[in-house]
A protein has these predicted regions:
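Amphipathic helical hotspot of TIR/SEFIR-family domains
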Residues: 56, 60-63, 85-96
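Helix-rich effector regions associated with P-loop NTPase G domains
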Residues: 1-4, 8-75, 100-103, 109, ...
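Short acidic, S/G/P-rich loop/turn micro-motifs used as interaction or catalytic elements
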Residues: 82-86, 110-113
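Conserved ATPase-coupling elements of RecA-like P-loop NTPase cores
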Residues: 87-90, 114-119, 227-230
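Canonical P-loop GTPase G-domain recognition
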Residues: 103, 111-174, 185-192, 196-197
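A short alpha->loop->secondary-structure connector
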Residues: 94-101, 189
């Protein structure tokens, strides 16, 4: 019998091992063969019920995949989440693709407030890429929701691939699958050939999308990045760390020794400085709560999972403890919590940002 592959994720179809990759029940397989649409059970559930089952790509598999990309003469399109650059850097990528042209794609640009200029974001992404040892040929901002942005992206890909194949790489949760779906629609008019979802680690095996000249765009599985907030939340609460709508900044006038809780996911302490406004950029649904710095830790312990959510009461058992990162700020600076959002400090201040253990907190020149 010829080998069949899931048209959702590309995994080889098998009917033996329920826990394994590409599993589908025999009855579903027969039905799929009749309709010509063979999905593994995981993709089927994802398509029809938005139900997510977790499958892990081992680090070993991922290294194999990077080797394959690095060994090919292809354009590498590296998709990152503008909202979470740190959480979307692929460790070691520059080492593997040193010989390839890399096009850096900043995704989810529609989430940034309209007041952010594209040129500023592009410049910032290029700076950050250089810090990570990458030398992209160009930076493109895009959004899977925006047709003209996808057209621009395709034009850039055509410009830089010079008749070669294209590999699309990215960590999980950067919106890569949704972007690939938009590209497929742009090229072929076929909607939803690939699974898209919000759970870390969804696309598996590489997907092939034919281009006019006999070349292919290959979509590769997302690697799970350990420093993303997304690992610590259930599917229902993932929405707080992958906003879908334009973020509305909120400014809080704080006195020194005041604290701002970011749901139960993090906290911001204004330790020392003149009274001033701090501007927050988080998902619009995330409830922020102001309190006194004194007793803030006890307040968190008492209210996390209740007044301070997410995490909810069930998730909080597994949720890592918050760890403090102190900063002395001199001028306009963004304090970024990887995968959650950022706080703009407008003047001189001594502050602390608390984030779950293992989640990166970094500073950057204010982007707005």
């Amino acid at each position: 019998m010829e080998e069949l592959f899931c048209i959702g994720c590309g995994a080889p179809i098998q009917t033996e091992n329920k826990e394994g990759l590409g599993y589908t029940p025999q009855s579903a397989l027969e039905k799929g063969l009749e309709t010509g649409e063979v999905y593994c059970q995981r993709c089927f559930r994802l398509r029809h019920y938005n139900e997510i089952t977790d499958v892990h790509l081992t680090d070993d598999d991922f290294l194999k995949l990077l080797h394959e990309v690095g060994d090919s003469d292809a354009l590498v399109v590296n998709v990152v989440d503008i909202f979470d650059f740190n959480g979307s850097v692929i460790p070691g990528l520059p080492r593997f693709v040193a010989g390839n042209d890399v096009l850096l794609v900043g995704n989810k640009k529609d989430i940034l407030p309209k007041s952010v200029k594209d040129s500023k974001v592009t410049h910032w992404l290029m700076e950050r890429a250089h810090e990570e040892g990458m030398r992209p040929v160009d930076v493109v901002l895009t959004s899977a929701q925006n047709k003209s942005a996808i057209k621009d992206l395709m034009e850039k890909i055509e410009q830089y691939r010079k008749g070669r194949d294209v590999y699309v790489v990215g960590v999980t949760n950067v919106g890569k699958s949704t972007l690939i779906n938009a590209i497929i629609q742009e090229i072929t008019g076929d909607k939803d050939i690939i699974t898209t979802s919000r759970f870390p680690g969804t696309t598996l095996d590489k997907i092939e999308i034919p281009l006019d000249d006999g070349s292919y765009i290959y979509d590769t599985p997302g690697i799970i990045h350990r420093h993303q907030m997304a690992h610590y939340l259930t599917a229902k609460n993932l929405k707080y760390v992958s906003p879908k709508k334009e973020i509305k900044p909120k400014t809080y006038q704080l006195n020194p020794e005041q604290t701002l809780f970011l749901g139960g996911l993090g906290r911001f302490d204004f330790i020392k400085g003149e009274k001033q406004g701090f501007t927050t950029f988080f998902d619009n649904e995330l409830k922020l709560h102001r309190t006194k710095l004194e007793g803030a830790t006890a307040f968190y312990d008492k209210h996390v999972g209740g007044l301070l959510t997410p995490p909810n009461s069930k998730e909080k058992e597994e949720f890592p403890p918050l760890v403090s990162h102190e900063f002395t700020i001199k001028d306009k600076t963004d304090l970024v919590i990887s995968g959650l959002g950022w706080i703009r400090v407008n003047g001189e201040a001594k502050v602390a940002v608390w984030a779950p253990e293992g989640v990166a907190v970094v500073t950057r020149k204010a982007i707005i």
